[in-house]
């Protein structure tokens, strides 16, 4: 049988070709590529992990081509090339092909509760009505947002108030510096004017003839004699020290003061007796810019056995007066005519002057009858007095300026007036009035600075510092006995601040009258300021208002004993507490005012009690119950040492009508009549 014939025997089968799994590639898969069989993922991964024998064939090549993808090679970029610039911000406003940009604002779900944006609130063009910040917020988040806004508002208000106080302090400092600069400029003008005058007089006295060939040599000499302002002040100090050495006892009359200097010094004067015109003693007259000093010539004590020649003399200060208190009269101007004039000329009255200081009168005569010292002294004295008056007037104008104010506007107005440096020219060319403060010389600007500090303490309610400052300035004013002008200015300023502070303390006392410590503190401050009467009146008035308010709160609802209980409790409890606090806050000498106040309110209570019991039968149970309640409450006054038992319910007790038997009411009399009728019927 041929081999190619049909047979039932099994033949050897050829192995079928296996399709190899897809080989992994180095590049990423396309986004649209998907796995052909997701259910066989695990089998494929296991098949890939095993090593397989590569098979060759057309079928495998076709399958490889089917499951393979070719990618182009990535371009090579230069690392040194600059980066690509970003898109401008304006490009985001226009729509494009790209996906829409996600919103930058965090949602309420992801970012939590809304926060207060201070930068947005500072924007004046903020559209408040269009804001959608709280559109999706819960009620708790809205309340929290409101609380945050309130905190921001309170913090802003506090910052604004602190800025106002800081600006006020800066304004005050600026005003002080301006006043100080103004005074320095005034002093500089004065010194320069006096220096110019002195140099002019020196030039006139030392200038040679212009026709002289040495005229050119005089110019450098004049320039060499010029001195600075500081040297002029030093020269004045040297003059005073020389005066102290020359005139014994002059230092106690003329201590060192800024601007004090000698204007004129003249000798060869004789003091005359005002009644007999006889010479008493030789004197030496020294005229300063603010005082007039008279020194007497006295002999020195020397040993007569060892001394030969004339006896030496010394100058001793006898009289010294403020220049504004002195009047100097020329006696030679009113000598008359005829024999009286001849007699006056023989006595030397033509060269005599009369000095008046208050009620005292002094007469001085110059020894040289043909000398011009008297006329020069009179002219220099008048000029010095006029200069001193102009200086005092300048200080008065500066002090009268309204520089006081509590608010921001008041300070601004005061500073604007202080900065007026173009005041009258006549008030800025002379030295200022000086006062002695703890051994140091101060001017009135120092007083203004202390007053400004008082204003700040009062505005900030630093009462202890304000009261201490007022006491210090008052003590300073009491010590200025020789300077009535400065004393008057200081007292006027201090009294104004004291009255203002007393009004503030009185309001505080009326607000805290029920508290012992606060009342005692306020009363102590008012007492130190000298307003004890105002403190007493404010306290008692506040307590009277409380009594009236509490009594009006008691309402009568038909139960008379209950109403009397309420009213009497209010009256006597408040009176007792008032007396108790008053005794601890005020001195014992003022207790009578409190007792008088208590008696006044007790009379008011008696009038109210009489009015309420006018419709009740005297002696009834209701009557007696009301009287007992009143006396029980009145006994509480004995705890503070006051006994008003005889004055309480005066005229309403039973013994006031002679102790007559209590009368029965209509109902009681009716019941009594029925009982009597029943008893008679039984008999």
UniProtKB/Swiss-Prot annotation:
Residues 1-128 are annotated as: Disordered. Gene3D superfamilies: Exo84p, C-terminal helical domain, Exo84p, N-terminal helical domain, Pleckstrin-homology domain (PH domain)/Phosphotyrosine-binding domain (PTB). Pfam families: Exo84_C, PH_EXO84, VPS51_Exo84_N. It is found in: Cytoplasmic vesicle, Secretory vesicle. Residues 32-48 have a biased composition (Polar residues). One of its GO terms (biological process) is protein transport. The keyword Transcription regulation does not apply. Keywords: Coiled coil, Cytoplasmic vesicle, Exocytosis, Protein transport, Transport. Component of the exocyst complex. Involved in the secretory pathway as part of the exocyst complex which tethers secretory vesicles to the sites of exocytosis. Plays a role in both the assembly of the exocyst and the polarization of this complex to specific sites of the plasma membrane for exocytosis. Also involved in assembly of the spliceosome. PANTHER family: EXOCYST COMPLEX COMPONENT 8. This is Exocyst complex component exo84. It comes from Aspergillus fumigatus (strain ATCC MYA-4609 / CBS 101355 / FGSC A1100 / Af293) (Neosartorya fumigata).
